[in-house]
Amino acid sequence: VLKGSTQEKFSMGELKPAGVTVVPYEAQDQVYLDIKSGRLDGTVADKVEVNGGFLSKPEGKGYGFVGADLYDVKYFGYGVGVAMRKGQDKLKADVNGAIKAIRSDDRYAKISKKYFSFDPYGN
């Protein structure tokens, strides 16, 4: 698991107490190397990162996602966010409106399928 990540907090809080050996890594690519070499059985990591950084590459062939997506608010909060300067209410409204608009028809799905084998928007 990537050191300092929300996935590490989840792993330490939920998996380690259940008897899973959790190994924190400084960089995600080190995790992939140890999975390939057989030193790790798996990882808890950001789905978009794993897809782009490993599964979509030749070295990721034969590997895939298992288990349910993790949405525990205690560890992961209420979704992703976009950083904006305070007081940028119009920009925030415009971004939220644009997201809502492309999700209201099939535009979002078409764009998403071009880049991902899953829905990165989540639940």
Predicted regions and their residues:
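Proline/Glycine/Serine-rich low-complexity intrinsically disordered segments
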Residues: V1-N123
